[in-house]
């Protein structure tokens, strides 16, 4: 099979195909314009039966696919599932919730991805929230949830409006900035 790239083709999918695979995992999620934590490596998904390099090039991580992929970039849902399965819980939830928040992944599909997790990661499902609007919110919410501190994402507070996180009964946390909420504050 031969591949052809037009001049506007981004470099990451081209590199992945030249390495014998497909753009996958975190790299594919970035290509699909999801918010992903900082990761400089190129993640290459290899079709079943394809040999993995004995010594991968520096800055490249290879992942084995269970079913073949015919495109140069893994479909969004498959790429998100790879991140959730292969990375730490925090990274997986950040990417999963980014996909849901962007409207590119239905919350039911996100829950389906979480159901497929191995037992050692299954607890992550209890922390999933379709309400997170940024990776920073997911990261902070998860920090409190892991410590069993009550936290409510996107809470509505009378006289204030919607806040990123309500921790306990009275602590308000704005994860990213006040910009999304400042218009409401200016009206008071």
Regions found by a protein language model. Name each.
Residues 1-119:
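Short gly/ser-rich loop at a beta-strand->alpha-helix junction or flexible surface loop bordering the NTP-binding
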